[in-house]
């Protein structure tokens, strides 16, 4: 036609001109509207109807809903269950086709008349359509289509391992993909394997900056992890991140917490060096040493109960703080001060071995 090959914005004006010249244009006016743009190129997105492949979800969703409601699968923290059930109870059919250059190609085949069959291989399609002149659909699968099969597709080459590893115990992931990935894996597990893919799902929060903005390249508010590790050490960064990660809530990243984590790692290292410099004297512990050792062992026992409770409830930041206080306050600030020998004196061999044992436990 007359507009073929034109830039879309130029074509719009050309169409309006032709309509006007034909006396068919009633009115033109400016409208304020929300215009979608590509995240990568910022180009204006043009909505248009197209043929796509859909997966009917109504038959797949019920076992996945029942599995969570019956606690066959438990979501942590508890409020994520409400989000999950809302998505599942209002589910729409899944558009699984994508117009991309890469991915798993749609296994649909066409003959010259447009007849279509879905087959695993070209040979099966040729037989089904009764002609060698077949072409495969050029679309590829949505990336989540392969991902929802992940809990058991990884065992395709080693099926004997599936009985041991499937279902697995715990999945740790982000709340932003609760429907895109987690819900679909649950549906696939019940549909294709007849059982859940995992027992527990722990949802982490979103990492945000101190202004509560999502970390992104576009905003430039995301620090380079390698730079943080170079400055504070890997353990320092881990501790700093966990300090601000209450169960399931968003994580407000503050670099000062990585610094605090680094101080904690140094505290552990300095305590190790201190114990390594002790010289031994008598074999048996003194009464004061025995009192300190027994007290520290009792504190470890109490902390283990707290840790068991925190981990069972997936409260990882609380577990970290229990460990932090046990090491920094109880072990370093109290126990070592009670046991370490005065200048020029020695610690008993039994107390030193007990201290090393406590160190290993910590």
Predicted feature residues:
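Acidic, turn-prone loop/beta-hairpin segments
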Residues: 110, 134, 209, 242, ...
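Residue patterns forming the tRNA-binding/recognition surfaces of aminoacyl-tRNA synthetases
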Residues: 1-112, 213, 219-264, 269, ...
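Residue-level signal for inorganic ion chemistry
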Residues: 42, 204-205, 268, 331
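Proline-centered turn/helix-capping motifs that create local helix->coil transitions or kinks
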Residues: 193-195, 269-284
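Short alpha-helical functional segments enriched in proximate histidine and acidic residues
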Residues: 94, 98, 180, 185-189, ...
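Alpha-helical recognition segments enriched in aromatics with Gly/Pro capping
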Residues: 1, 99-249
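A short secondary-structure junction motif
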Residues: 147, 151-155, 210, 243-244, ...
């Amino acid at each position: 036609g007359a507009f073929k090959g034109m830039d879309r914005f130029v074509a719009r004006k050309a169409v309006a001109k032709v309509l006007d010249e034909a006396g068919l244009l009633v009115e033109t006016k400016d409208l304020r509207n929300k215009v979608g743009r590509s995240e990568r190129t910022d180009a204006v997105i043009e909505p248009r109807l197209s043929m796509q492949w859909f997966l009917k979800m109504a038959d797949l969703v019920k076992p996945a809903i029942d599995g969570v409601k019956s606690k066959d699968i438990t979501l942590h923290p508890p409020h994520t269950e409400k989000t999950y059930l809302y998505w599942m109870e209002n589910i729409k059919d899944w558009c699984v086709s994508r117009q991309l250059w890469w991915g798993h190609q749609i296994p649909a085949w066409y003959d010259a008349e447009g007849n279509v069959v879905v087959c695993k291989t070209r040979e099966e399609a040729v037989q089904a359509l009764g002609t060698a002149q077949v072409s495969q659909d050029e679309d590829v699968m949505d990336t989540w289509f392969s991902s929802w099969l992940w809990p058991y597709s990884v065992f395709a080459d080693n099926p004997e391992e599936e009985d041991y590893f499937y279902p697995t115990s715990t999945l740790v992931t982000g709340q932003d993909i609760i429907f895109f990935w987690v819900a679909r894996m649950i549906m696939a597990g019940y549909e294709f394997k007849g059982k859940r893919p995992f027992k527990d799902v722990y949802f982490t929060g979103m990492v945000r900056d101190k202004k509560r903005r999502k970390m992104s390249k576009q905003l430039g508010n995301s620090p380079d992890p390698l730079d943080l590790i170079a400055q504070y050490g890997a353990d320092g960064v881990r501790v700093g991140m966990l300090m601000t990660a209450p169960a399931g809530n968003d994580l407000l990243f503050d670099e000062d917490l990585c610094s605090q984590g680094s101080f904690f790692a140094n505290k552990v290292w300095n305590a190790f060096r201190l114990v390594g410099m002790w010289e031994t004297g008598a074999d048996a512990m003194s009464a004061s040493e025995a009192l300190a050792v027994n007290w520290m062992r009792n504190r470890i026992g109490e902390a283990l109960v707290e840790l068991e409770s925190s981990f069972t409830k997936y409260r990882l930041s609380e577990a970290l703080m229990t460990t932090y206080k046990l090491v920094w306050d109880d072990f370093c600030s109290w126990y070592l001060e009670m046991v370490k020998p005065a200048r020029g004196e020695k610690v008993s061999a039994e107390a030193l071995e007990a201290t090393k044992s406590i160190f290993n436990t910590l």
